[in-house]
Amino acid sequence: MNIKDIGVIIAKKPLKENTFIITVFTKNHGLYSGVVKEFSKKSKFIYQEGNIIDFLWQARLHEHIGMAKCELIKSYTGYFITNKAKLYAFNSVISLIKELFHEREEHSKFFLFLINYLDNLSKNFCFRDYINFELALLAETGYKLDLTKCGVSHVTTDLIYVSPKSARALSYEVGKPYKDKLLMLPRFLLSDNSEITLEEKRQALALTNYFFNRYLFHNNRQVEARQTFIEYTLNNF
């Protein structure tokens, strides 16, 4: 059987000499892995993580790993390799997708979200965009946070907390008696114009980290590329 789609290469590992297994996040078919062969400089350039490709997957049976053929559409390597903030954000993003999405599970809308994020990242690293990516990833995996209004009073002002139980924002008045048990809601997530302080970066990463750990990172397992991104971001403010 054949699968033809557009995709982003999110992993590549050696199988034997000049032969690799690539994992591709495709628009209409989710994650697919296939065997590719590299016999030229051109093919080595094509099979790089982050490349957008035309993807052809062929196998006798659907459950087989299959062979893959790819044609390059766009490469981001040159945009990320010389900028650590961009590179670490990129590595974190594709590692999270590889970790949290199941093979052959469609995420077509999120695929478009990823392409838009990579385009923006190629131009400029933005911490707000990165956190919004993690929030979107949580939502895509079934754990959406509602930060638009207070989960109790429904007011839309003075929101400074997030309930770890309901994943909803809470106003100052509602949350004050329980503040030691609540997560902080970074101000920049409520306004596109606000400057982002180091403390707000810590709050934002603690917010998404809590829900990743509670629902998705089992047995306290962490994504190494994400940890590298966090350490770099908090130490290079």
Curated annotation (Swiss-Prot):
One of its GO terms (cellular component) is bacterial nucleoid. InterPro entries: ARFGAP/RecO, DNA_rep/recomb_RecO_N, NA-bd_OB-fold, RecO, RecO_C. Keywords: DNA damage, DNA recombination, DNA repair. Belongs to the RecO family. The lineage of its organism: Bacteria, Pseudomonadati, Pseudomonadota, Alphaproteobacteria, Rickettsiales. Involved in DNA repair and RecF pathway recombination. Disulfide bonds: none annotated. This is DNA repair protein RecO. It holds the Pfam family RecO_N. One of its GO terms (biological process) is double-strand break repair. SUPFAM superfamilies: ArfGap/RecO-like zinc finger (SSF57863), Nucleic acid-binding proteins (SSF50249). The keyword Hydrolase does not apply.
